[in-house]
Amino acid sequence: MASAAPDAPSLAAAQKLAGSWSQTGQVEKAIWGLCQGSGSKPYQAIVDLSGPAYKCSCPSRKFPCKHALGLLLEWSTGRVPVASQPPDFAAEWLARREEKAAAQPAPAAKAVADPATAQKRAERVASGLAELDLWITDQIRGGLASMDTSWEALDGVAARMVDAQAPGVAGALRSLAGAVAGAENWPDMVLSELVRLHLLVVAHQKMDRLSGPLRDSVRAHVGYPVSTESVMELPAVREHWMVMGSRITEEKRLFTRTTWLLGRAAGRWAILLDFSHGSPNFSGVVPPVGHVVDADLHFYPGAAALRARLGTTHADAEPFTTLPPGNIEAALQSYTDAVGADPWLRSWPVVVTDVTPSYVDGSWFLVDRSGEALPAEGDSRMMWTLLGISGGYPVSICGTWNARCFEAFSVFVNGQVMAL
């Protein structure tokens, strides 16, 4: 059940609910129960095992919440009895899920791209990027010390990029505003991003001279759309994919689920991105963290292809108990290789084994047995949780490296992956 938890504290909280359950039950593909909290009314928790999907009446923003996790723990230990039918609160939610699944429209006929429309968009993008490059030049000439790095200023430039149909560039500018807020080394961060964006503008101007994969990368970073249908038509990569981590984020009620996969045989990384507006109820089904699945992945085109879509699965997912080796040197080299292929990448997933989380003079590091260290960053509670899980001993950690710091998304302890 640990693989379903959004983080270690949620799992710990779920384990404390063992004596709080009543009216639990299960049918073939669902479990439910009432969990008494601090209020007068117990929380109603439901898990659709076929998803899995979760529902709870509590106000928690974590997904799944501790009540859904606690219900799964009750079920896994055999304390949820079989019932003839679910109660009304569970039956209604399950029925709505079935109706939603049945109402999924049939695949539409593949639309043929209009060359005139594509050309018009390319011209709008080119015009917008030319304005962006002029703005970048003005910032460099005026000096970064006088640059307005406020959210309002950068959001104004980002809005212009949205109008120019370059949402990838707009997202980079908005992310920059959040990154520089309060950062001591913000001039270095700003300069690096401005250089990256200038290089993207130049590459877009000379796309006809680029190789096919690099041209695809430029289009992806600018924000040209790629249809799901076209991706699924690309050759599949069949592997035993290990689910190394999963994280749900939210921005303006848009929930994004990122799932990191690692091919057991070839060591190739992939990420799956799923989106849901209003609530974290994702339609796509992915194997839980800590499981390996024999499946096909279809990768989005690019010079360092990483994002993919899940295709045919050839067997049920099952837990894995070992990780491939991965030291700090190999992690840095894999990042270097990826950026060498796609210079606009900001981070790359890596595994580092036998490293110890260390807190030194207000900063976090991952230190291997030879004394080599990687600077690490992340939410303070998450980093202290990581240290607590390790117990001060070497562990294997999965995360992303961005040339500046390592950000963990899971830890491997005693043959089990725990999401952070």
What spans do the regions from the language model cover?
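Long, low-complexity, compositionally biased intrinsically disordered regions
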Residues: M1-L420
